[in-house]
């Protein structure tokens, strides 16, 4: 799906990141970091897109320990242009320690590091709790005080936060289901941004109500991950027609629609680079 996504960015004159997470090759049978880097070298256009290593957990969705450092080191060696360490299932002190180590590796290579604090649910086995219950209780929301300390002590460049967002399932019985139409707690997001003063990241962007997404971008949310919606467009067409080129076209059209009509990002690429391109 990489080629149609990148072509959509070019045709809409927008900027984005192509991402691969451990979960996708571990459970979803996607290609691993080396194969993705090779494909990106073929299709990538540096004025429009960068390659990001997403969600490398210390403890995974099955509560198993992950040998995460070799994965991150491999990606850096392969030329990935940013990386993410996910220590969100650790306690705060452990998350800080793990993240700080990866930040040092990334910065030594001259690239930014994303980290996560709070519980962005959706990748766990089995059905999640009712969404309205989660949102009303603030279960898993990133704590403002902890976020301030976390950023100060780790030096992370981007922080993934939990403010009502949930991941889409990428494996199992739920992976083809339409995502819950999530909301975002904008006031909580604003407080997080004021406390941390770093770009915040929204994981689980597919299915979030548009009004909340747009308001979030005005309150510190700088990077929005969209995976489920693009993947499902590709897979649905592949099931219907069994023709890869048609599935790629469906992926391309969905990505262009997201860029142009949903987010209004057409023609904004130069803003990312301060008008330098």
Q: Which positions does each model-derived feature cover?
A:
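Alpha/beta enzyme core
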Residues: 1-24, 31-48, 59-196, 210-221, ...
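Glycine-rich beta-to-alpha transition loops that act as phosphate-gripper elements at the mouths
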Residues: 52-59, 199-210
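Metal-cofactor-binding active-site regions of metalloenzymes
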Residues: 27-28, 53-58, 266, 270-271, ...
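Extended, intrinsically disordered, low-complexity segments
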Residues: 238-277
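Charge-dense, low-complexity intrinsically disordered segments
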Residues: 27, 179, 245, 249
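Generic enzyme active-site microenvironment
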Residues: 52, 114-116, 201, 258
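Shared catalytic-loop signature of beta/alpha-barrel
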Residues: 223-242, 253
